[in-house]
């Protein structure tokens, strides 16, 4: 889509607002919400809060972000027990993300080893002196394996480990003040966004053979979906991140630097990128070869799940408090966003926005 040009006054001085393109105006998957959302939210929130991973003030901000809503939008058509696992997973992701954002590379690596040991040994008690993320991870997986089939479990463990090691790379970039070019950023971000383990839940009752799962077209569809999630996430998170001086791992900032363009130009550039990805996905998602039943039905459901994930991420970005606080629904409709001023030190240390 064409991004509206700011007024002449805004162009001649520092911008005070920007326009978020409606990248999903023609996306065929409608918003849907799992009917078990409220129950899963209550249960998952109680599970997560009992570990006291955040200060009371940060926990309040964390709850307002409602990561259970994200899961219930993304897994709208899955059974309640799988949706509950999805809620727990989103909460686990953001416990890891929020804490690792303040860690150096070596500290993140320690966490990664703890988390993976907990996932591989869900019945083994965790050491008393270990960071609480170990027990959070253990109990998450202890519950998840009750409703995820063997193939789903295998893919989850493999891709969650890949996600964690990408978080180490992100921490290393942060330690060394690295600003990546767009292509290398996308390579790392495809793993740090956590989409691949999230997609493993779509396979909860499937047994897709590796040759089907790794078919080049299905690989492409997965990558195009992930890239749309990245662009959509970074468009919505940019304002908060630039105000915190934490936009070095956001494609908006990287496009501005790489292409030497302003914020408006970056929004248009990213909108065009997203349009290209959506076009490729929609032109190809019905062109998978046939392997016979039940594989064809599994592949169809899996791809439908990918398409729904794109809509879910967009809907949550505006309905949640995380990026726009109480102004999300207006911004979703009107698309104009007021640029936030630099956050003060108290804002950065007292909440986990």
From Swiss-Prot:
GO BP term, example: isoprenoid biosynthetic process
Broad enzyme group: lyase
Residues engaged in binding (2E,6E)-farnesyl diphosphate: 322-323
Cofactor(s) essential for the protein: Mg(2+)
Documented EC number(s): 4.2.3.135
SUPFAM superfamilies for this protein: Terpenoid synthases
Site positions (Plays a critical role in the stabilization of intermediate cation): 94
UniProt short sequence motif DDXXD motif, positions renumbered to this chain: 97-101
Sites where the protein binds Mg(2+) 3: 233, 237, 241
Binding site for Mg(2+) 2: 97
Residues the entry annotates as binding Mg(2+) 1: 97
Catalytic activity: (2E,6E)-farnesyl diphosphate = Delta(6)-protoilludene + diphosphate
Pfam families: Terpene_syn_C_2
Entry keyword set: Lyase, Magnesium, Metal-binding
Keyword Magnesium: yes
GO molecular function (one): terpene synthase activity
Family label: Belongs to the terpene synthase family.
Domain notes from UniProt: The DDXXD motif is important for the catalytic activity, presumably through binding to Mg(2+).
Function: Terpene cyclase that catalyzes the cyclization of farnesyl diphosphate (FPP) to delta(6)-protoilludene.
Record protein name field: Delta(6)-protoilludene synthase K435DRAFT_659367
Organism: Dendrothele bispora (strain CBS 962.96)
Source species taxonomy: Eukaryota, Fungi, Dikarya, Basidiomycota, Agaricomycotina
